[in-house]
Amino acid sequence: MKNNSKLRSWLDDLNLDHPLVIAGPCSAETESQVLQIAHDLKNSDVSIFRAGIWKPRTRPGNFEGVGSIGLKWLQKVKKETGLLITTEVANANHVKIALDHDIDVLWIGARSTVSPFIVQEIADVLQNTDKIVLLKNPVNPDLSLWYGGIERLYSCLLYTSDAADDRM
């Protein structure tokens, strides 16, 4: 896989004089909690506000996140603070819903990264978009698994000519 510096332009467009900082609550629990934290971070070095909307849990019955209602809270964060917004997506349906809510940055969490099937389904949904996607390291230290996820996402970009032309 060839490194393409043009794919980095979204980061350069932020015109940062400091490292990129992404911050926010691990889990969005209430609208007021999300908005309060976002306003507290607004005048800091934070460029991207993050909040977990869907929380993958090992056992059913534990808090699994507020779901898509939380995406409306993130939209409010962007409107009120000007911060870019991001959340974790764990499957193709999450991506579709996040795209419908114009979430700026998507991240694929460590649990999803370990499944090539999930990463491919997410990549397929992202075709014809110019969405920024971050891929977390897998829960087990397997560099080839992580690299495979990057290749799947990168291939999605390469085979999407309009989006690739816009981003390069």
Predicted regions: what is each one?
Residues 25-35, 136-148:
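Active-site glycine- and acidic-residue-rich loops that bind
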Residues 1-22:
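N-terminal amphipathic alpha-helix/helix-capping segment at the start of soluble metabolic enzymes
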Residues 20-34, 62, 86-88:
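Active-site mouth loops of central-metabolism enzymes
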Residues 64-86, 125-128:
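Alpha-helix-loop-beta-strand connector modules within alpha/beta enzyme cores
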Residues 159-168:
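Single conserved hydrophobic/aromatic residue that forms the stacking wall/gate
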Residues 50-68:
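Glycine-rich, proline-tolerant flexible connector loops at the mouths of alpha/beta enzymes
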Residues 84-91, 104-115, 132-141:
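Catalytic beta/alpha-barrel core
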Residues 45, 99-107, 125-132, 154-158:
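Glycine-enriched alpha-helix->loop->beta-strand junction motifs that scaffold or abut catalytic
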